[in-house]
């Protein structure tokens, strides 16, 4: 889908949503898209036409085009590949990390920092209690639960239930498991020296598990453990950032062909009809988890840098994620498909999410988006718009 006439004329980025893009809705503009040949599916040709003299560029398949009119109970044409149907959340630009001046925390305060710590602590407790939270999907580890995240789950559960009598014992447990994770992947005690390459050959689920595990250990060490040896804990921030970059890179090359690690059956073969819908859903879960995990990591490191170095602290940047409520919470592939095919899911960059504050969709954003906006633009300002 091309940009609408209003965005094209103003030379502004268009969200290409139907019936009206986000910019037009927020400004009350008449949103008109260029006429196009009606088609239920947009197939990507194997090669450019021989008569064409122009540079060939395969059409990008967005979520509205991909799922419009699809009955989830019908079998899909097996020629419709996973890569084509998933391109709205797996194309190259969806993995970009973007830094914007908007991400400077000009409205940030110590009150917001305390709110962030409470929020993330609540999310981690939610994961321990229910098996999911806004950046760890309930389906993610339903089939395969890597040892690294098992250890983090155990340490986190102990930490959340600590008492004054056993607190130091549990802090030691967290520290030893954190160091054990680094040792397993070839890092020294400070986490600053690579001893041997251990990232090569890691499967995507192992990338995700070790990043989320180290995130948990770092959160406890940086914000929860008042007696922590901060120089050692801080030195591991660089490892966390490096691992997260490797995770994103692995996802960008793996997800487009389909992620089967969290499917009940991982037998190779053709996927179409209901099986293809299930594969699409699980591939989206993994890709969305990767991007939300990046944003959670970037926020934690950014805020810690803000506390330590002030407003000159570097920011890792943000990634795209779905901002509308209901998509992440869908309990089945069919429910997920119905949501994606009937309305906008609000897939956008963190740096662009501020536009939601001025749109009618503001009251429909999910918890992860709300927290992201509060940390970027201040809780008081965001809550005024949401109310």
Q: Which ranges hold each PLM region?
A:
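Intrinsically disordered, low-complexity segments that are common in secreted/host-exposed effector
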Residues: 6-9, 16, 23-26, 167-175, ...
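Hydrophobic/aromatic-rich effector regions of fungal transcription factors
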Residues: 131-140, 151-161, 179-247, 302-303
């Amino acid at each position: 889908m091309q940009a609408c006439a209003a965005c094209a004329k103003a030379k502004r980025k268009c969200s290409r949503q139907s019936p009206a893009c986000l910019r037009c809705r927020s400004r009350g503009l008449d949103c008109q898209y260029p006429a196009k040949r009606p088609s239920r599916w947009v197939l990507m040709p194997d090669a450019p036409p021989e008569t064409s003299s122009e540079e060939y560029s395969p059409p990008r398949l967005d979520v509205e085009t991909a799922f419009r009119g699809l009955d989830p109970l019908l079998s899909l044409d097996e020629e419709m590949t996973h890569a084509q149907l998933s391109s709205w959340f797996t194309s190259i630009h969806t993995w970009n990390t973007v830094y914007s001046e908007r991400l400077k925390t000009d409205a940030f305060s110590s009150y917001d920092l305390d709110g962030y710590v409470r929020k993330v602590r609540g999310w981690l407790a939610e994961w321990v209690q229910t098996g999911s939270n806004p950046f760890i999907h309930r389906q993610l580890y339903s089939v395969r639960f890597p040892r690294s995240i098992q250890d983090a789950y155990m340490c986190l559960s102990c930490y959340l239930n600590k008492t004054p009598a056993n607190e130091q014992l549990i802090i030691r447990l967290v520290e030893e498991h954190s160091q054990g994770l680094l040792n397993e992947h070839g890092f020294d005690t400070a986490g600053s020296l690579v001893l041997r390459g251990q990232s090569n050959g890691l499967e995507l689920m192992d990338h995700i598990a070790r990043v989320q595990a180290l995130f948990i250990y770092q959160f406890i060490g940086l914000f929860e453990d008042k007696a922590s040896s901060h120089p050692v804990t801080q030195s591991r921030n660089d490892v966390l950032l490096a691992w997260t970059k490797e995770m994103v890179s692995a996802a960008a090359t793996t997800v487009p062909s389909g992620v089967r690690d969290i499917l009940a059956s991982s037998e190779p073969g053709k996927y179409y009809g209901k099986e293809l819908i299930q594969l699409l859903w699980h591939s989206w879960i993994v890709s969305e988890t990767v991007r939300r995990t990046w944003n959670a990591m970037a926020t934690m490191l950014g805020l810690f840098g803000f506390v330590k170095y002030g407003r000159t602290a570097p920011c890792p940047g943000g990634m795209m994620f779905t901002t509308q409520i209901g998509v992440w919470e869908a309990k089945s592939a069919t429910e997920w498909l119905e949501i994606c095919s009937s309305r906008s899911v609000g897939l956008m960059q963190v740096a662009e999410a501020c536009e939601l504050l001025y749109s009618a969709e503001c009251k429909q954003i999910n918890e992860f988006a709300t927290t992201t906006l509060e940390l970027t633009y201040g809780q008081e300002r965001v809550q005024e718009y949401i109310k």
